[in-house]
Structure formats: structure tokens, C-alpha cells
Amino acid sequence: YLHEIALLGMRTADLHTSLMRSHEPSFNAQPFSLADRRRLTVRLVASARDAFDRLDARQSALSSDAAADAATLLRRRGAVLDLLQRLDRLSIDVHAIRCHNNYHLGQILRTEHDFVIVDFARPPGMEAPVVLRTGFFRKMLRRLAPPVRPAPDGKGLALVDVATMLRSLSAATATAHHAFLVRRPGEAARIAKWVACWEVWTSAAFLTAYLDRAADPPYLPADERQLRQLLAAFVLDTTLDELRHYVDRRPDRAYIPLSAALSLTRQLD
């Protein structure tokens, strides 16, 4: 299975490189400017504030365990916002490119020996392919796809696609873990360490293969510290966006992004 995840990482790098190398002028990579960085920071901070506000307002709709986790996460609000605001002081040397902008496991079709990436941003009114409108695929998308914002106009940072896929892998793992415990609740302690190990290894396989395949392109920061900071911020942003969605629409499933957000912010205590 790790080989399959690594292949997905390589195909993601191929996607970004292909989008950057298009002969269409509108696909040319462009430097990520100081103004771009400031707009990014403002958006991330505003989105995080909104997620915390909604979580605070909807705690009563959560289960007792989820409400306790929510209270813990809310105590980290200030530290999370400080972390995101630091991006404005980060001198990012990277180029923006056309990206998928809605990238998760629900957008991946498995062929016999490879993957096909589908459902790029479409013009208004254009429907998805028929196969993706069938009941099976609609159900798959609901289960595997964390909600994302509409694709922004213009170009963005490729690491956003990487972050949303990493979050999707995490959400799929958490969903399978929960389904297992419903059937075998007595094995919670035994299985927890294996679930954590599985998530770490799948994420590492995807990210390592992606970075190796991309091979220092202009759409990734050459500085490893910058790359780590940006990716961590985007994964956290995606997780909080997912949390906001579930708190509003599916509070019974809010435990999935809540648990992930707690894990991502644990070092901030």
C-alpha cells in the first residue's frame, strides 16, 4: 500500500510540473510577491478566527468527548493565530502556479497500474463527468473528501494541494479507525498506536515521493525550513476549514477534524 501512496505522490508532482510547463502564457509560473504573502496571511488568520468562533458557538451540539476536545482546542486559539501571523514575516522564495485547488482522495481514480486525477475547477454550469455523478462516487466523495473552499482565481502555491491530500489521508484513516472501534470497542488501546503509525507512514510515503519527483522546482521553496512552515500552516488551515464545515453541518463527525487539530497544535501548549 505504501508503494501506491508513493505513486500518488509522484503523480501529484507530475501534475504540478505539467501545469507549470504548459505552453499557455496564463499557466506560466510567477513569483510569489510580498503582497501575495500578506494576502495569504490575512486569509489564513481570518479563516482560523472564523473556525474558532463557530466552534465556540456550537460546542453544545457536540458529544461530551468532542466538546472536551473543543474546549482544549479553543484554549490554543491565541497560539494558533500567532503561528499563522508569523507567515507574514517569512521571506518566501517560491513561485505560484496553476494548481488543482480541490485536491483530495475523492478526486483520484485508480486504474490497473496508476492513478487518474479528476475534477479540476470547471467553468460555471459545467457538470462533472457522468461517472462521478453516480451514487457510488457521490458516496465515496462524501466519506473521503474533506470540504474545501471554492478554487480561487489565478495561481497559488502547490503546497496547498499537498496539504489537502495529506489531510485527506488523515481523515480517511480516522474514519476507518472509528468504524473499527464501533465493531470492536474493546481494542481501542491496542489499535491506537497502529493507527498513528499508519498515518505517519502513509503521509511520509506521499510527501517523500512528491518531493523526490518534483526535484527542487520553482513552485516549492528551496529552503527546507520555509517548506516545512508553509506546509504545516496549510495542513492546519485545511483541518480548521474541515472542522468549521462539520461543526456547522455534521457535528456528529466533528471528532475527526477535532482530533487532527489537537494533534497539530499539541506543541503549542
Predicted regions and their residues:
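ATP-dependent phospho-/nucleotidyl transfer catalytic cores
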Residues: Y1-H100, T111-H113, P124-K155, L159, ...
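Alpha-helix capping/termination and helix-coil
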Residues: H23, S91, E112, L166-F180, ...
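Conserved catalytic-loop position in the HRD/HxD motif
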Residues: N102, Q107
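Conserved active-site beta-strand element of glycosyltransferases/polysaccharide synthases
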Residues: I117
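Alpha-helical D-x4-[hydrophobic]G micro-motif in the C-lobe of protein kinase domains
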Residues: D161-M165
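Substrate-binding beta-hairpin/strand module that engages nucleic acids
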Residues: S170-W201
